[in-house]
A protein has these predicted regions:
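N-terminal Rossmann NAD(P)H-binding glycine-rich loop of SDR-like oxidoreductase domains
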Residues: 13, 17-22
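A conserved structural motif in NAD(P)-dependent oxidoreductases
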Residues: 210-221, 232
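Rossmann-fold cofactor-recognition segment
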Residues: 40-54
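Catalytic loop of short-chain dehydrogenase/reductase
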Residues: 77-78, 83, 106-176, 186-187
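Short, flexible catalytic-loop segment of classical short-chain dehydrogenase/reductase
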Residues: 184-194
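Short, small/polar-rich loop/turn modules that mediate ligand/substrate recognition or access, typified
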Residues: 176-178, 236-238
Length: 259
């Protein structure tokens, strides 16, 4: 019989995070949610603010047991202030992961939810690398706020940085844990209206059309997160998995929806 794993999920109170919590709980794993508010009753709850390093450190200290899987799902949209976007979506996530990985069991996994908004990281690699190699949370947020004009740009850059940093971190921690990202397109979550506000229907609607006329469901993203955290994904490391029904690639290639 497979032993139950200890799983930490950030942002587990709603949306994709809630679906991730339910997936692991249904498989008999012990789940701890780090969030600003309680969520699924199937999980233990620890209050944590990913925009505050001291809050992150306190949450890590409260775990009190080895961790097998970390799922970084918490995030804010481009409708939020630039500093908050950079803090929650990347620098807080990075701080939490760096604090937690040394406490993780060998053979564990870190899966972070990025976005197809980070698809073009290669086009901005110099700027992205500056964020990735920022020495700490405060310095990184300062670098980002000085160079990014609005929330939409900050959201994109935060997800680009997450994808690139994960590749670096996968090499740093290789042999101990695996790190990968999952990049959804538009997903039906409570946060989706904010994405329409910040990115516009003109940008998101074509992706929905190319995906077959609907947005993703939280459970469809959670299933990929669960796979990457499993032993079946043991040879996947430092990789970004796009989960958008092929929409971003179709858009990039200029393909029309078949009649």
């Amino acid at each position: 019989m497979t032993r139950s794993r200890s799983v930490v999920v950030t942002g587990g109170a709603s949306g994709i995070g809630d679906a991730v919590v339910r997936r692991f709980a249904e498989h008999g794993d012990e789940v701890v949610v780090l969030d600003r508010k309680p969520g699924n009753a199937a999980a233990r709850y620890i209050e944590a603010d990913l925009n505050d390093c001291s809050s992150i450190d306190a949450a890590v200290a409260s775990l009190g047991q080895p961790v097998d899987v970390l799922c970084n799902v918490a995030g804010v949209s481009g409708a939020s202030p630039v500093q908050l976007i950079l803090g929650v979506n990347f620098f807080g996530l990075r701080h939490l992961t760096d604090q937690l990985v040394p406490r993780m069991s060998a053979g564990g996994a870190v899966v972070s939810v990025a976005s197809t908004a980070g698809w073009y990281w290669r086009d901005h690699l110099d700027e992205v690398t500056r964020l990735v190699h920022a020495p700490d949370f405060a310095a990184g947020v300062q670098i980002g706020t000085e160079s990014l004009a609005n929330g939409k740009d900050a959201y994109t850059r935060s997800k680009e940085a997450l994808i690139v940093w994960t590749s670096y971190a996968a090499q740093r921690y290789r042999g101990h844990v695996r790190l990968n990202t999952v990049s959804p397109g538009p997903v039906e979550t409570p946060l989706l209206p904010e994405f329409y506000d910040s990115m516009g229907h003109e940008e998101l609607d074509p992706l929905t059309e190319l995906a077959g006329g609907r947005n993703g469901r939280p459970e469809e993203i959670a299933s990929v997160v669960g796979f990457l955290a499993s032993r079946e994904a043991s040879w996947i490391n430092g990789t970004d998995i796009v989960v958008d029904a092929g929409a971003e690639m179709a858009f990039e290639l200029g393909q029309a929806v078949p009649a």
